[in-house]
Amino acid sequence: RGAIVDIDPFGSPSRYLDCGIRATCHGGLLSVTATDLPVLHGLYQAACQRRYYGIPVRTEYGNEIALRLILGCIHLVAGRLDVKVMPLFAQHNMHYYRVYVKVLVRTDPEDNMGYILHCKSCGHRKTQKEQNHSCEVCGKKIESAGPLWIGEIYDKAFVDSMLPKLENFVVSKSCEKTLLKYQQEIGMPATYFTLDELARKMRSAPISLEKAIEKLQKAGFKAGSTSLNSSGLKTNARIDEVLRFFQN
């Protein structure tokens, strides 16, 4: 078995996960890349369900849903083999999604599978174990993405260990900024708002990301930026609470 195993096919990695997990030693690193973006973004929901055992919802944060669908699929395949996978890191660009997990040859007592619920009427979103049919904010129909991974995507110790090593490599300055954003995301709720999305709902010019974070933190909420979108805002505040604070 290998200490580092890389699955990087053209298209979906799902058919190779069983072999990839079996080929990784206890404590080893498995990296998985997906390039079938139209499927993960919800253009072909039936294909997504066949490949990743879950369906997406088309939203502003579709890239996060895609990463969580991939992690959820890996978790389900690993569970069948009595193996635990622990997400360490994830990255994306215009052409692919890539996740890194630690493989542990033992059963996983934690259940980090669930759904992202998204209301296309008011914009409310949340994660939970079960599906709902109506939005708790506006009462209208709510859509469900999943089942997918609803736990942490980034491991704090893994991300922290990378930062001091940057000086040993020739990398761009944006690399450090991105890693610092990963640090901020640890412990934050899944999904994010975009400033443009909030501005449309308020019918006003977008507020700056720094101001938005500061305002929510002063009000007692968790708030921070995300590596998944340069104008993305992660917070545990509901959409109605966010809009109320920004409109005042």
Predicted segments, located by residue:
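SAM-dependent transferase fold signal centered on methyltransferase-like domains
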Residues: 1-248
